C-alpha cells in the first residue's frame, strides 16, 4: 500500500484538534447491525484509533475477514494483533486496493486558523485536500471529504456505514457531496439526534451501497436494547436534493402557498469587518448616530432599536453605503436563532450586522403586519421543526427560500403593480 508523506502532528495534539469524538457503544452496535461484507472480505475503519468498529464488527460477524485500520495519530493507533494498522492520513492515502466494507466515525470540523477553528493542525495540507476532492465546497467540513474518499475506496457493491453530523442533509456546502452520493449508489440515512454526550450535534448514520440508486430516509427509536429503525420515506429518483422529514401536512402547506424565495430577493447583511472599515462608523454613541443592529435586536414581530449589542454606531443615512437596502424599510428574518423562524419589519431602516434581509420582487404587494404574523406563527414553527428537526443550529438560506406564504397572509402579485413597502 502506498503511503503519502505523513503530516507532522504537534506533540500535544488533542483529540479535539484532530476532530475526534468517541462513539457511544450503542451507536457502534447499531451501525454494525447495518454493516455487511462477504466472508473473506476487506473491512476498513478510517481514523480508527483503537478500532472500536473493527472490534464490534468482528464480535458480531466473526473472524473470517481481513481487518484494516488507518490512523494519522501515532499516539492513538492501538489495534489488536488480528488487524492491520496503518499510520497515514486517510484523505491522502492510496491503498491500491478496494474494500468491501468501510465503517466508522470520521473526524468532523472545519480546517482553518487556530483562532477560529478547532481543526487547525490540518491547515498545512488543506490545499491538497481541496485538490483531491471533487465535493469540496465553501467551508467544507472534514467529514464530507472522508465520505467522498470512502466511497471511492469501495468495491462495486461495497457498503459504507458512517456516523456523521446531520448538517450535510441541508447545507449548501454539501450540495456537491449529495449529488456525488446520488450518482455513485444507494443512500440510506438514519436519524439519531443528539446522541453524543456533551455535544450539541445532531447525528445521522449514513449507509451507502456502491450499487443501485435512490434515497431511503429512516427515523429511529431508542430503547434499552438500542436503536430501532423506522422507515420514513423513499425517494427512488433522488438526485442530491436537500433531505427533509416531509409529511402530508408539510406537503399540503407548501402546495397551498408560494415559496418565500419567489416573492423576495434575499440579501445578507454587511459583516463586522466592513463596518469597522467604514469611515462613518464609531465605537461610541454620539449625536446623529444609531446602533448597528445584530440578531439580538431582532424579536418575533418587532425590532429593539435602543440596545446596542454590536458596540458600533453610525449615521443611519450612510448605512446605504454598505448595503443599498439599508435605506429601505424591509423584512428581516433571523439567521442566528436556531432552526426556527423569527421575523420583523424594520420600519426605521437601520444598519444591520447580521440576519437575512428580504426585499419584495417587482409586482409583489405586501401587508407587512400579516406577513410578519404568519412567519412568527406556531404553524410556521411546527412546519420548520417537522422538516428540519435539529439538523443545523440556524435557519439557512435554502430553508428560508422554501417557506410557504399563502395570499391571505399578506401578499398578492400583479404585473402592473409596483413595490409597496
Curated annotation (Swiss-Prot):
InterPro entries in the record: DNA_methylase_N6_adenine_CS (IPR002052), MethylTrfase_TaqI-like_dom (IPR011639), N4_N6_ade-DNA_methylase (IPR050953), N6_DNA_MeTrfase_TaqI (IPR021188), N6_DNA_MeTrfase_TaqI_C (IPR023135), SAM-dependent_MTases_sf (IPR029063), TaqI_C (IPR025931)
One Pfam family named in its UniProt record: TaqI_C
Assigned protein family: Belongs to the N(4)/N(6)-methyltransferase family.
Consequence when changing residue 196 to W: Essentially wild-type activity
Keywords: DNA-binding, Methyltransferase, Restriction system, S-adenosyl-L-methionine, Transferase
GO BP term (any one): DNA restriction-modification system
Annotated positions for site Important for catalytic activity: 105-106, 108
Protein name as it appears in the record: Type II methyltransferase M.TaqI
Compositional bias ranges of the Low complexity kind: 1-18
Superkingdom of the organism of origin: Bacteria
Catalytic activity: a 2'-deoxyadenosine in DNA + S-adenosyl-L-methionine = an N(6)-methyl-2'-deoxyadenosine in DNA + S-adenosyl-L-homocysteine + H(+)
UniProt organism field: Thermus aquaticus
Molecular-function GO term, any one: site-specific DNA-methyltransferase (adenine-specific) activity
Outcome of swapping residue 108 to F/W: Essentially wild-type activity
Region feature (Disordered): 1-20
Gene3D superfamilies from the UniProt entry: Adenine-n6-DNA-methyltransferase Taqi, Chain A, domain 2 (3.90.220.10), Vaccinia Virus protein VP39 (3.40.50.150)
Amino acid at each position: 500500500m502506498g503511503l503519502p508523506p505523513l503530516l507532522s502532528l504537534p506533540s500535544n495534539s488533542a483529540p479535539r484538534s484532530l476532530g475526534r469524538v468517541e462513539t457511544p457503544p450503542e451507536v457502534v452496535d447499531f451501525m454494525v447491525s447495518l454493516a455487511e461484507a462477504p466472508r473473506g472480505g476487506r473491512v476498513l475503519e478510517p481514523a480508527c484509533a483503537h478500532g472500536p468498529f473493527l472490534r464490534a464488527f468482528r464480535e458480531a460477524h466473526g473472524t473470517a475477514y481481513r481487518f484494516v485500520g488507518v490512523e494519522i495519530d501515532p499516539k492513538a493507533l492501538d489495534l489488536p494483533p488480528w488487524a492491520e494498522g496503518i499510520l497515514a492520513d486517510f484523505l491522502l492515502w492510496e491503498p491500491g486496493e478496494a474494500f468491501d466494507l468501510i465503517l466508522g466515525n470520521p473526524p468532523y470540523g472545519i480546517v482553518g486558523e487556530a483562532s477560529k477553528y478547532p481543526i487547525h493542525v490540518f491547515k498545512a495540507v488543506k490545499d491538497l485536500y481541496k485538490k483531491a476532492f471533487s465535493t469540496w465546497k465553501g467551508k467544507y467540513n472534514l467529514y464530507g471529504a472522508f465520505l467522498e474518499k470512502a466511497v471511492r475506496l469501495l468495491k462495486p457493491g461495497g457498503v459504507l456505514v458512517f456516523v456523521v453530523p446531520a448538517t450535510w442533509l441541508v447545507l449548501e456546502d454539501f450540495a456537491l457531496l449529495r449529488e456525488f452520493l446520488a450518482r455513485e449508489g444507494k443512500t440510506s440515512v438514519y436519524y439519531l439526534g443528539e446522541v453524543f454526550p456533551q455535544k450539541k450535534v445532531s447525528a445521522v448514520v449514513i449507509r451507502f451501497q456502491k450499487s443501485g440508486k435512490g434515497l431511503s430516509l429512516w427515523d429511529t427509536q431508542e430503547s434499552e436494547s438500542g436503536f430501532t429503525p423506522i422507515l420514513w420515506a423513499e425517494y427512488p429518483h433522488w438526485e442530491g436534493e436537500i433531505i427533509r422529514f416531509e409529511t402530508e401536512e408539510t406537503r399540503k402547506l407548501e402546495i397551498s402557498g408560494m415559496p418565500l424565495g419567489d416573492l423576495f430577493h434575499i440579501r445578507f447583511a454587511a459583516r463586522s469587518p466592513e463596518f469597522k472599515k467604514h469611515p462613518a462608523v464609531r465605537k461610541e454613541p454620539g449625536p446623529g448616530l444609531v446602533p448597528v443592529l445584530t440578531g439580538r435586536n431582532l424579536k418575533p414581530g418587532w425590532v429593539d432599536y435602543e440596545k446596542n449589542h454590536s458596540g458600533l454606531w453610525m449615521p443611519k443615512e450612510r448605512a446605504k453605503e454598505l448595503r443599498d437596502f439599508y435605506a429601505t424599510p424591509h423584512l428581516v428574518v433571523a439567521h442566528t436563532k436556531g432552526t426556527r423562524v423569527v421575523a420583523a419589519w424594520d420600519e426605521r431602516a437601520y444598519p444591520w450586522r447580521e440576519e437575512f434581509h428580504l426585499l419584495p420582487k417587482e409586482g409583489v404587494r405586501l401587508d407587512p403586519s400579516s406577513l410578519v404574523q404568519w412567519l412568527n406563527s406556531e404553524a410556521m414553527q411546527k412546519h420548520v421543526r417537522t422538516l428540519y428537526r435539529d439538523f443545523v443550529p440556524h435557519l439557512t438560506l435554502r430553508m428560508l427560500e422554501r417557506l410557504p406564504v399563502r395570499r391571505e397572509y399578506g401578499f398578492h402579485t400583479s404585473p402592473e403593480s409596483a413595490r409597496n413597502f
